[in-house]
Amino acid sequence: MSKAYKRPLRSGYTTGACAAAVAKGATILLLSGEAPEKVEIPFPDGSRHSFCLSQQDGTGACMGTIKDAGDDPDVTNGALILATASWEGEDGPTCVHLTEIRLCGGDGVGQVSKRGLSIAPGEPAINPVPRQMIEAAVAEALSQHEKRKLTITISVPQGLELAEKTLNHRLGIVNGISILGTTGIVRPISASAWKATISACMDVARSAGLEQMVISTGRTSEKGAQQLLDLPEEAYAMMGDYLQFSLEEAGRKGFSTIHYAGMWAKIIKAALEVPQTHVRNGALEVEAAAQLLKKLGADEELCKKLFAANTAREMLSHLEDEGRDDLVKAVCQYAKKYAEKISEKTVHIYLINHRAEVIHYE
């Protein structure tokens, strides 16, 4: 039987690239009175890409495009990104002067409220590379003889609603989404995007003067840790599966103490010193986990059950049924030892169950 064909995951465009495209389109509309159906803009790597645009009725020189994030599960995929070009307008709290234009954050674009990010507090949450892309795209449309400074306002009508599905509130970005991107391209399920978010969370925590960082594998694990820890919201970062990176990053940024909260499958992977805990990067080897538990003192009858288990949760159930809290503790100690070796900091381990309860602390 032939194997089923699996097409490669499709890349898409960042909100920053979309914002640059509609900014150029709005500038053309303002200058010529004609709305372009398509524009081509430069990307940071020197390549050029085309975007389909639509004029927005009754809003002046305003153009829009629908963000296509490809096969990446991006919350902004399918969102309408708008830009309005004008010569008028007073400076407001969400505007910033660039070299050639004045850039403003409109409805649905967040505003930075905390230190530690690449954008200063009070400015629109439009990151440095998107700002450069917007200015470069607009420059291609501006007349060389035009001396007045152009105002570009970026808006995302669904931005406030979409922001609730992001970590923006924790980063100190209020009232909307961020306009993001470093290359203009969205890579499906991008590791670099995950890591950048983790690092940004840690930067915000350090800028707030925090000495302790809580890294968790997901929202359930984070909720469990919050039951024991009296720390501000900025101290928490969901690292997903990027365990080794998060430990190294927390160590590099100088936190004195790291709290690692995870469910059993993730904790036992840490005990096995698996640096990236997603199932596609080394599915939990039941045999390896069972071998570790055997080494730690599981008896013959228990080992039979452990080696026959299909999942990590099933293994934990066997340990609980047999009253082997000592083995659970030993696994957490191994995970702690690994985490402290990687981070070179003091690490506390919190084993969380599916009800967001802490069932062991080390």
Swiss-Prot record:
HAMAP family named among the record's database cross-references: CbiD (MF_00787)
Keyword Electron transport in annotation: no
The EC code for this enzyme is 2.1.1.195
Superkingdom, according to UniProt?
Bacteria
Q: What's one GO BP annotation on this UniProt entry?
A: anaerobic cobalamin biosynthetic process
Q: Of which family is this protein a member?
A: Belongs to the CbiD family.
Q: Which InterPro entries match?
A: CbiD (IPR002748), CbiD_sf (IPR036074)
**What name does this protein carry?**
Cobalt-precorrin-5B C(1)-methyltransferase
Q: Which gene encodes it?
A: cbiD
Give an example GO molecular function: cobalt-precorrin-5B C1-methyltransferase activity
Its keywords, alphabetically, are: Cobalamin biosynthesis, Methyltransferase, S-adenosyl-L-methionine, Transferase
* NCBIfam families noted in UniProt: cbiD, PRK00075.1-1
Q: Which reaction is this enzyme known to catalyze?
A: Co-precorrin-5B + S-adenosyl-L-methionine = Co-precorrin-6A + S-adenosyl-L-homocysteine
Q: In which pathway does it act?
A: Cofactor biosynthesis; adenosylcobalamin biosynthesis; cob(II)yrinate a,c-diamide from sirohydrochlorin (anaerobic route): step 6/10
